[in-house]
Amino acid sequence: MNKTYYLTTPIYYPSGNPHIGHCYTTVACDTIARFKRMQGYDVMFLTGTDEHGQKIELKAAEKGVTPKEYVDEIVANFKRLWETMHISYDRFIRTTDDYHIETVQKIFKKLYEKGYIYKGTYKGKYCTPCESFWTESQLVDGKCPDCGREVKEANEEAYFLRLSDFADKIEKFLTETDYLQPKSRVNEMVNNFIKPGLEDLCVSRTSFTWGIPVDFDSKHVVYVWVDALSNYISALGYGNEKYNDFEKYWPADMHMTAKEIVRFHSIVWPIILMMLDLPLPKHLYGHGWINFNGDKMSKSKGNVVDPFVLCERYGVDAVRYQILRDMPYGSDCNFTNELMLTRINADLANDLGNLVSRTVAMADKYFGGTLPTDRVSDELDNQLIGMAQSLCDTVTPLIEQAQHSKAHEEIFKVISRANKYIDETAPWVLAKDESNNARLATVLYNLLETIRICSALLSPFMPATMPEVWEQIGAGAEDTAFDKLGTFGVLRADVTVKKGRVLFPRIDIKSEITELERLMKPKTVIKEDEDLDKAGIISIDDFAKVKLRTGEITACEKIKKSKKLLKIQVDDARGGRQIVSGIAEYYTPEELIGKKIIFVANLAPAKLCGEESNGMLLACDAGEKVQVVFLDKDTPNGSTVR
């Protein structure tokens, strides 16, 4: 039976669509999950969404929808992003799932019956965006110490969790084990929250209704942290019959989360488990933030980075690599478009991409793609072979400890050494004399072996591109197995290479920065009470120039070169026309066929991804979604819209 490994991301709060900051934790966990699977572990990788709370309730009310309708749309975008970024999660939990609700109600009741939860009155400060209560002494300049926003007075009946009874136990747990990483976080928790006096935690609310009801006191809903944290065990079947592998996977091998919620995962969560007499998780890694141009990302600041844009322009693996490469262990990192593009060019296009393309091209040019089996070694080979042979042992603990940036450094040291080895051995000079063929074959074989080892260790980080590398260098699945990565000389002596595409094309940084700034510029929302002059007034004569007509969509298909464009055939009662529209992210072709629409009939033809477009559909920008204006099915095609 294989050893098990259970790791989790935090469950994300779907108050808005995901951005690059959400991607760091998820890609970091996905990398570890893939690496442990390479090692032969039975992995359970959990992610999901934390969907209750006052903030969600308020945002849903603003949009005129129910909280469940509000989160459903955003959760779908999270899942779409994880699919785009090749996240190999095993389970996705939503706190609105029935089985999770059942577990939370049982846990709350059990803790109440054991005397760990009691009823009282909460008086203090509350931050709605963070869903956090604070004492006056914890505020920074009178504002929330986590997000810096205004707090409000709260005074309501509530249930409390007796954290104070476990102050000594939790301090001992944090200081005498290696649970919380990096170690600097331990001092933060002990000095800021435990030593000043660990306070009991408010765990229910009566001032809003969007939450899990306390089944023995219906006017209360379970407050965020008992609800959210319990996902790590409800997803395994604890307290419900949905799953039955709690005994198999618990305790968790690693929880990973951003530093702002380390307090709840390092203090509240272990205490809840102690109260339930359950084993404690083995490790918690609290990573830093990705800042954009030196400032923490925030939708309210308009500085979030859209990962869909980056993945479409530069490839998923380049984005996965970059966001892990520049995050120092336990510290914040600064994300800028220029840094990202420079990193892609330097590491992926120049170092890795050139190493693969040059090596494969030389094997193809000098030996027709298949190396001869004769070999002549030289002292020049020893350092490269030694570095490649020991790389797996060096990188393994780094990946297991979420030190992904350091793991990348070690791998690219070997890649850089291999590029230097090409210059030292000068294969193009050896190729001029047939008597050097055995030596030339040795040099190329050493390069192919180095690429095999490096690409296999990079595959958890870049799972889509590395199989292409293996195909080019003639490596089979057995050649890149984990148990072969500490051995040099695994490829067949007469290995055959196969030239392929350029894996990471070089980027024109200056022009790309301009384009990214345009694509990621925050949309300006014109409020109803703004002066219309600001939006631009047109005359009736100008408006009369626009010819609007009705039509029926008779056929629709995706354009292969784009993730955003659909090619639409419209019956306009005048012979038909083709319209290309950027709505593929919001509608499938099947949803549109047969729909009656309004289109601009006298728009000049335009070429989009090689397809001619003769018109434009009418649609409205509905917040996070674009909605096409559909007409009644009985509307005649070709009618003029007045």
Region locations from a protein language model:
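Secondary-structure transition/capping motifs at alpha-helix termini
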Residues: 1-2, 35-42, 63, 67, ...
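Structured secondary-structure scaffolds
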Residues: 1-47, 99-103, 153-365, 409-411
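N-terminal catalytic cores of NTP/NDP-binding nucleotidyl/phosphoryl-transfer enzymes
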Residues: 2-74, 93-108, 113, 130, ...
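A glycine-rich helix N-cap at a beta->alpha junction
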Residues: 76-88
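Cys/His-rich short segments
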Residues: 114-167, 171
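Helix-rich, typically C-terminal accessory recognition domains appended to large enzymatic cores
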Residues: 119, 326, 331, 339-376, ...
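Phosphate-backbone binding interfaces of nucleic-acid-interacting proteins
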Residues: 524-642
